[in-house]
């Protein structure tokens, strides 16, 4: 999702921090060719890695144009990492 503009506020930053994720890490996952799945309620689930190799799930919504709003992010479970690696082959 190179070229996306990220929308956020203090509330988003605090929410990510509760999950141990820095906003820059969430953005890095989205910029690093993630595996993206769409949910029934128009949210997107991005499975990917940071530059440091950390595996994260980033939940986001697309806004107007190139704007993306990250809702939450967390570490992938071991099962999710395994599935991510399999689908990335």
Which ranges hold each PLM region?
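Ribonuclease/tRNase effector modules and their secretory precursors
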Residues: 1-89
């Amino acid at each position: 999702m190179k070229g996306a503009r990220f929308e956020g506020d203090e509330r988003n930053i605090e929410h990510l921090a509760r999950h141990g994720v820095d906003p820059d890490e969430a953005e890095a996952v989205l910029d690093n060719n993630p595996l993206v799945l769409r949910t029934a309620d128009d949210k997107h689930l991005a499975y990917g890695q940071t530059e440091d190799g950390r595996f994260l799930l980033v939940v986001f919504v697309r806004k107007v144009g190139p704007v993306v709003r990250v809702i939450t992010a967390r570490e992938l479970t071991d099962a999710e990492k395994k599935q991510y690696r399999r689908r990335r082959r």
